[in-house]
Swiss-Prot record:
Residues 164-228 are annotated as: Interaction with E4F1. The hPRC-H complex purification reported by PubMed:12167701 probably presents a mixture of different PRC1-like complexes. Induction: Down-regulated by oxidative stress. This is Polycomb complex protein BMI-1. Monoubiquitinated. May be polyubiquitinated; which does not lead to proteasomal degradation. It holds the Pfam family zf-C3HC4_2. Component of a Polycomb group (PcG) multiprotein PRC1-like complex, a complex class required to maintain the transcriptionally repressive state of many genes, including Hox genes, throughout development. PcG PRC1 complex acts via chromatin remodeling and modification of histones; it mediates monoubiquitination of histone H2A 'Lys-119', rendering chromatin heritably changed in its expressibility. The complex composed of RNF2, UB2D3 and BMI1 binds nucleosomes, and has activity only with nucleosomal histone H2A. InterPro entries: RAWUL (IPR032443), Znf_RING (IPR001841), Znf_RING/FYVE/PHD (IPR013083), Znf_RING_CS (IPR017907). The gene is BMI1. Changing H174E: Strongly decreases affinity for PHC2. Abolishes interaction with PHC2. A zinc finger (RING-type) spans 18-57. Residues 162-182 are annotated as: Interaction with PHC2. GO terms for molecular function: promoter-specific chromatin binding; RING-like zinc finger domain binding; ubiquitin-protein transferase activator activity; zinc ion binding. One of its GO terms (cellular component) is PRC1 complex.
Amino acid sequence: MHRTTRIKITELNPHLMCVLCGGYFIDATTIIECLHSFCKTCIVRYLETSKYCPICDVQVHKTRPLLNIRSDKTLQDIVYKLVPGLFKNEMKRRRDFYAAHPSADAANGSNEDRGEVADEDKRIITDDEIISLSIEFFDQNRLDRKVNKDKEKSKEEVNDKRYLRCPAAMTVMHLRKFLRSKMDIPNTFQIDVMYEEEPLKDYYTLMDIAYIYTWRRNGPLPLKYRVRPTCKRMKISHQRDGLTNAGELESDSGSDKANSPAGGIPSTSSCLPSPSTPVQSPHPQFPHISSTMNGTSNSPSGNHQSSFANRPRKSSVNGSSATSSG
């Protein structure tokens, strides 16, 4: 598995900052012709004197450029979630502005325009925020009972859950170490922190978990843990040593066979016929033909002669053929 690469916020700044004011996007607005984004107040003020994009010089509109710009809520949410404290500071600035200028018309604006939206309502989580979470043991039997719509809860099940308050920047690895030290779990066992039935990565922070699984703040962040034996793995060096020893044993056995009197004789145990199997001739198709060398014929064994005693046999002696009977 490949670990997710974590990059610095400064590497993303070119995609999160407005080229007109040099700050992070506030009320991000995108030109639909070229998809370049700017702060709303920055691009509106710029288009009062120009009808072209500040970045690529594409014509926004011939006469009414404000018709071809759109508010980009998705991009703005990304900026608020990536830049720590930006949303909270912006809401404070808006509240201070309307407090200093009571005559400003904010009645038609939304709560966010007036700075009256809290981080909890916007689901924005900062690194220094304290998150409430619950941790309990993952019991497969209890899960099966839940699937079977068994709604009865015993006192033991309720007491298994523990509640913690942790910084949003706390990682799953820190939570695993806390559980190991709190419950004295030996190193021969592995602890998995889970959300529902899915194990979590060690480098996930509580803020990452809240964003990934869309935690709504309607209760503590529900986490579970399980304990299982650590899988033992044989070291590669041990495996290589075993293979080397096996090779040496095979070579030793081969040399012993070569030095033994029967070392050069191939094994024929698998080729021996059984008592019920008839003996086959070297020429199974023509058993009556025998080979001749230098005028002498090679006769078969005594047992073989008896089986073919009554059959005529041809042989050639010094170029002349003769027929003899047994």
